[in-house]
């Protein structure tokens, strides 16, 4: 019986793998060349800083523009929806995310986040409303992140709905500093503290009230709407309807972006 070295056997195995792989790669290349080209159609190129969108039905899309307009696209027809909101359109602010209610067929509610301005300060605010005659009506403010700060970035703002039908909303840390000596304190403290909404995921009932099973409800000094904390600028959130999990995307300063599962 002949004895073969480990190196010899390894080379033979490697050669067999190559023989098996090359045809597969060629087939994959052929399939992609013939079937993997994306098909797309440009619906409109008349948008100004689009930020969020919601499919109202199979043909209508409602789009938020940070510059302050809502646009309803039906096929190629664009209608402007009047909002009259006091929007801080500067930096990363403006009209932000928009989602339709999980019960939209019954209540026709739409949920919108925007950078609300007051006395030169701003914050992330959440409203819900209906649309009638190309304007928003029945407007209710459901939430505003506290405190207001003198910053025009890191609003977060993304919306989704969890398995139980709660609304989840992201709020950024707002990059809130006024002097160089405070930078370290702000980055280490604010998103980690439970007495403010900065750098948090917020969990609400659809009417803006606080769910009774929120994790920090009843904790001394904690704001009851907080669901998770310690975020920088979470500008993506997704509910996987297959397994019920919720994920957020948290932007890093120069790389270091994170995808976090909320548990």
For each feature predicted by the language model, list its residue ranges.
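Bacterial N-terminal signal peptides that target proteins for export
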Residues: 2-13
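Bacterial N-terminal signal peptides
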Residues: 11-22
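Generic anion/oxyanion-binding catalytic loop in active/binding sites
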Residues: 17, 42, 87, 190, ...
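Bacterial Sec-dependent signal peptides at the C-terminal "C-region" and cleavage site
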Residues: 20-30
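Acidic, Gly/Ser/Thr-rich repeat motifs that build Ca2+-stabilized beta-propeller blades
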Residues: 28-177, 236-256
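Beta-propeller domain segments
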Residues: 30-34, 93-95, 105, 173-263
């Amino acid at each position: 019986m002949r004895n073969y070295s480990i190196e010899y056997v390894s080379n033979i195995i490697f050669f067999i793998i190559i023989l098996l792989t090359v045809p597969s790669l060629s087939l994959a290349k052929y399939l992609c060349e013939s079937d993997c080209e994306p098909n797309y159609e440009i619906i409109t190129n008349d948008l100004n800083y689009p930020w969020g969108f919601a499919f109202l039905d199979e043909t209508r899309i409602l789009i938020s523009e940070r510059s302050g307009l809502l646009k309803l696209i039906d096929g190629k027809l664009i209608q402007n929806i009047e909002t009259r909101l006091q929007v801080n359109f500067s930096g990363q602010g403006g009209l932000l995310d928009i989602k339709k209610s999980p019960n939209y067929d019954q209540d026709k509610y739409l949920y919108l986040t925007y950078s609300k301005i007051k006395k030169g300060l701003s914050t992330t605010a959440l409203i819900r409303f209906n649309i009638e005659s190309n304007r928003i009506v029945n407007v209710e403010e459901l939430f505003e992140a506290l405190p207001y700060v003198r910053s025009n970035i890191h609003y977060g703002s993304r919306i989704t709905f969890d398995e139980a039908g709660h609304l989840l909303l992201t709020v950024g840390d707002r990059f809130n500093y006024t002097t160089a000596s405070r930078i370290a304190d702000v980055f280490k403290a604010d998103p980690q503290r439970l007495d403010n909404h900065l750098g948090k995921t917020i969990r609400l009932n659809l009417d803006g009230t606080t769910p009774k099973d929120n994790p920090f409800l009843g904790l001394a000094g904690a704001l009851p709407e907080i669901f998770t904390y310690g975020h920088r600028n979470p500008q993506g959130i997704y509910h996987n309807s297959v397994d019920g999990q919720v994920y957020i995307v948290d932007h890093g300063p120069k790389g270091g972006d994170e995808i976090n599962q909320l548990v």
